Amino acid sequence: MSRITGTFAELKRTGKKALVTFITAGDPDLATTEELIPLLAENGADIIELGVPFSDPMADGPTIQLSSERALAAGTTLSRILATVKSVRGRTQVPIVLMGYFNPIFSYGLERFAADAAAAGVDGVLLVDLPPEEAGEFKACADRHGIDVIFLLTPTSDETRIRTVTNRARGFIYYVSVTGVTGVRSGIEASVAGNVNIIKECSKVPVAVGFGIATPEQAGEVAATADGVVVGSAIVKLFEKHRGEELKGALATFVSSLKQAVDRGRYDN
């Protein structure tokens, strides 16, 4: 059982849902990232997504694009991100998912990346531009090294795509709550609950919902149906306003409030 699967199973055993938090690796620098991973876990993050900065982040809105630019300007590379994960493993065992685009992984080498990521303590990888139909070689490498490959479903996914993803899913399925790029939204789409239930009818793999979740109220609303709630842009936006200890305090307060809201969306068991 992977660390991600074990986390969802333990949360479900206690009736709770998962809070998944996203930060960009290397924003403002990797030393700060290494400090923030344990802080996020201590304040309620059950799983942490580390964004791998990329020069052409087509699925990301302005907030995460700017964050990626800051990280790249600070000299962040994939190999340095893996070294950071390996270093932080002495302080926390929270599941870590690398989220990004296929090009940096391809350039690194698929087998080499999977081996190095597993050795560093990476638990999962989500590549937004690698659909399951094209992921065979990469997934085989990841499977050999015990890394969960996480796929996306969207409001426009038809039954064939849903079955394709659910048949290949490991760790969790990431349901994108809106069409378009990442970013804060004013409300949750009415279709989310129904679409999540359709996915869950096809698979026992947990479903986490992300994109556009910005407030504890929205997180709690999504947690009523989903197995997990992903918050990204609203967290990354704090990096625009705060630095140092002030950033740590702002993150701790916000993530704690998100976790309290997610905990209210309990399972019926």
From Swiss-Prot:
**Keyword Lyase listed:** yes
Q: Which UniProt keywords apply?
A: Amino-acid biosynthesis, Aromatic amino acid biosynthesis, Lyase, Tryptophan biosynthesis
Give the intrachain disulfide bonds: none
Reaction(s) the record says it catalyses: (1S,2R)-1-C-(indol-3-yl)glycerol 3-phosphate + L-serine = D-glyceraldehyde 3-phosphate + L-tryptophan + H2O
Q: Name one GO molecular function term.
A: tryptophan synthase activity
Q: Name one GO cellular component term.
A: cytosol
Q: InterPro entries this protein is in?
A: Aldolase_TIM (IPR013785), RibuloseP-bd_barrel (IPR011060), Trp_synthase_alpha_AS (IPR018204), Trp_synthase_suA (IPR002028)
Q: Which positions are catalytic residues?
A: E49 (proton acceptor), D60 (proton acceptor)
Q: Describe the task this protein carries out.
A: The alpha subunit is responsible for the aldol cleavage of indoleglycerol phosphate to indole and glyceraldehyde 3-phosphate.
**To which protein family does this belong?**
Belongs to the TrpA family.
Q: What is this protein called?
A: Tryptophan synthase alpha chain
Q: Which organism is it from?
A: Geobacter metallireducens (strain ATCC 53774 / DSM 7210 / GS-15)
Identify the coding gene.
trpA
